[in-house]
Amino acid sequence: MKKAWRAGRLANAIKVAGMPQRPRVTDILVLMVPPLLWAGNAVAGRMASGLISPMTLNLLRWCLAFCILLPIAGQVLRPGSLLWPQWRRFALLGLLGTSGYNALNYLALHTSTAINVTLVASSTPVWMLLMGRLFFGQAISPRQVLGAGLSIAGVLLVLTHGEWAMLQQLRLVKGDFYVLLASLGWAVYSWLLAHPTPESASLRQDWPRFLLAQVLFGLVWSSLFTTGEWVLTPAHVDWGWPLMAVLAYVAIGPSILAYGAFGAGIQRAGPHVAAHFTNLTPLFTALLSAFFLGERPHLFHGLAFVLIMAGIALSRED
């Protein structure tokens, strides 16, 4: 009886993961958590750019997240855990999601502007559709393409403050290509989350363990990247309270809480829907600036929110 119950639960998990349903209000609220927390990530990374090298920042971020998750999810590391038969898949998730994506973004912030980084990252819904079509057999509907366009338009509205002529002043630099590579990797990472193997689907029911498994392999990749950084470049760490505050924020908020919420959102709504929510990040950044810095919100912020939410609505499955 117990085995049958577990089998039914696993089958349901696989069905939910493989066939995303129309998102409910609770799913939408969950998917709004990651961009809200990630809104401060670019700011924190920019603040820390003079205090610590980008690869080192990423390594320390996930080291701290690992230490936080270990007491509550350490069972996944034991011999005989469902993690080890799936270690290759988790190694790929760790590379694309926890290690490579963030390392490339931090690296980009050393050579590019926050506007350029956000602009290139806003193309993620497009890459999500293309990766789903090329590698996971997902059809692309005209309304999904329209939804991606509206979502990107909403981001552009925030970045240009409603003055489209500002786009003519943008110049692509090396850091922008780092963000493009990160966005492509994030698209593959999201689809892998949506199409788990039976074993990883079972493990994903406990998201702290599922995330810790990714972080474990992400640390391996991050250690390799950081070693190369210290060997090949003049890497540095300027210890102090400002850096410690940045590390605490990026480890707890954008790492543990945001990744857990994003994974849960993908499981229910699918990668193509979840991708549009990431485009709320620049809008939330502007709203947080209004709250903490006293900067007044403007009409274009409201219009941008409408465009992004319209893109989300169009991206949903019928």
Predicted regions and their residues:
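Glycine-/small-residue-enriched transmembrane alpha-helix faces in small-molecule transporters
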Residues: 2-6, 12-59, 166-200, 220-221
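C-terminal-most transmembrane helix of multi-pass membrane proteins
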Residues: 5, 14, 19-20, 29, ...
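Helix-helix packing/entry segments at the starts of transmembrane helices
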Residues: 58-60, 98, 102-103, 116-123, ...
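Membrane-interface helix-cap regions at the ends of transmembrane helices
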Residues: 47, 51, 65-83, 153-169, ...
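Hydrophobic transmembrane alpha-helices of multi-pass small-molecule transport proteins
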Residues: 69, 91, 131, 140-162, ...
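Hydrophobic alpha-helical transmembrane segments of multi-pass integral membrane proteins
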Residues: 26-30, 56-71, 92, 147-153, ...
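Hydrophobic/aromatic residues within transmembrane alpha-helices
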Residues: 48, 57, 61, 108, ...
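Specific transmembrane alpha-helical segments of multi-pass solute transporters/efflux pumps
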Residues: 37, 41-44, 70-121, 131, ...
